[in-house]
């Protein structure tokens, strides 16, 4: 049996709050990579953005990290990493990728088999490939003037790679065709299709909560309880960041 390439998926974003759509992205991406026969996804990482991101209605990072941890209680392969949220200032996506790549070089995680319980090999694990996981809406932002640095896009798709999950109203193949950098490295961009259209947005969740509407079955129950216990996303609870930074590479 040919050895598969181990992969770690990293998603950067606000996770304000984390939703079932965020979690589904990981599952869809993992299935897609496994079905290629080339890759074995061994870990997923959720990296909530720093408080200085400056986005309206952004809950404090310790709340967003806590909610992500609660949402991931039932996952045996995805974890939340607070490093980005704990930095002194907002971090560009490529810098977050560099940090986690450096960690993987120092201490690669154990590679598990398709049943998520048994190691594929008894030999020392190869250093996994780190790929940025995003929705097609983020891929579209690569075209937005002055939002991404070309050098950063180049590094992301050349050194790391992308796994892009499709969304309604977006044409990821078209976005790639329109970008010289993306076209050059399209072999390192994986387009995963979500068979069940899932358009849950954190923006909608916040609006619904602010209006006292139910969000059950849209976000995990444990997250709903946390939001209620801490009075988040209600009228008058808005937390604003300290600066207005670029929205580069971030998911709501």
Swiss-Prot record:
InterPro entries per record: Cyt_trans-like, Euk_NMN_adenylyltrnsfrase, NadD/NMNAT, NMNAT_euk, Rossmann-like_a/b/a_fold
UniProt binding sites for ATP: 22, 56, 140, 203-206
Assembly notes: Homotetramer.
Activity regulation description: Activity is strongly inhibited by galotannin. Inhibited by P1-(adenosine-5')-P4-(nicotinic-acid-riboside-5')-tetraphosphate (Nap4AD).
Reaction catalysed by this enzyme: beta-nicotinamide D-ribonucleotide + ATP + H(+) = diphosphate + NAD(+); nicotinate beta-D-ribonucleotide + ATP + H(+) = deamido-NAD(+) + diphosphate
Highest rank taxon of the organism: Eukaryota
Broadest EC class assigned to this enzyme: transferase
Keyword line: ATP-binding, Magnesium, Mitochondrion, NAD, Nucleotide-binding, Nucleotidyltransferase, Pyridine nucleotide biosynthesis, Transferase
Family: Belongs to the eukaryotic NMN adenylyltransferase family.
GO cellular component terms given for this protein: axon; mitochondrial matrix; mitochondrion; neuronal cell body
Full protein name: Nicotinamide/nicotinic acid mononucleotide adenylyltransferase 3
Primary gene name: NMNAT3
Annotated EC: 2.7.7.18, 2.7.7.1
NCBIfam families from the UniProt entry: nicotinate (nicotinamide) nucleotide adenylyltransferase
Names of required cofactors: Mg(2+)
Pathway(s) it belongs to: Cofactor biosynthesis; NAD(+) biosynthesis; NAD(+) from nicotinamide D-ribonucleotide: step 1/1; Cofactor biosynthesis; NAD(+) biosynthesis; deamido-NAD(+) from nicotinate D-ribonucleotide: step 1/1
Role according to the record: Catalyzes the formation of NAD(+) from nicotinamide mononucleotide (NMN) and ATP. Can also use the deamidated form; nicotinic acid mononucleotide (NaMN) as substrate with the same efficiency. Can use triazofurin monophosphate (TrMP) as substrate. Can also use GTP and ITP as nucleotide donors. Also catalyzes the reverse reaction, i.e. the pyrophosphorolytic cleavage of NAD(+). For the pyrophosphorolytic activity, can use NAD(+), NADH, NaAD, nicotinic acid adenine dinucleotide phosphate (NHD), nicotinamide guanine dinucleotide (NGD) as substrates.
């Amino acid at each position: 049996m040919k050895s598969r390439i181990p992969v770690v998926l990293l998603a950067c974003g606000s996770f304000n709050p984390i939703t079932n759509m965020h979690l589904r992205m990981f599952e869809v991406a993992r299935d897609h990579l496994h079905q290629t026969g080339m890759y074995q996804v061994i870990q997923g990482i959720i990296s909530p953005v720093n408080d200085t991101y400056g986005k309206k209605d952004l809950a404090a990072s310790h709340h967003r990290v806590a909610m992500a941890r609660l949402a991931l209680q039932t996952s045996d392969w995805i974890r939340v990493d607070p490093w980005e949220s704990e930095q002194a200032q907002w971090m560009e996506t490529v810098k977050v990728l560099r940090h986690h790549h450096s960690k993987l070089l120092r201490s690669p995680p154990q590679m598990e088999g398709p049943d998520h319980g048994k190691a594929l090999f008894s030999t020392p694990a190869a250093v996994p490939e780190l790929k940025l996981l995003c929705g097609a809406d983020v891929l579209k932002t690569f075209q937005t003037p002055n939002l991404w640095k070309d050098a950063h896009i180049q590094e992301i798709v050349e050194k790391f790679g992308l796994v892009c999950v499709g969304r309604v109203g977006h044409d990821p193949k078209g976005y790639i065709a329109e970008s010289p950098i993306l076209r050059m490295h399209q072999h390192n961009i994986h387009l995963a299709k979500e068979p069940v259209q899932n358009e849950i947005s954190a923006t909608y969740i916040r609006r619904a909560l602010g209006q006292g509407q139910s969000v059950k079955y849209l976000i995990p129950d444990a997250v709903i309880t946390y939001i209620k216990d801490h009075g988040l996303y209600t009228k008058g609870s808005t937390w604003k960041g300290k600066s207005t930074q670029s929205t580069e590479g971030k998911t709501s």
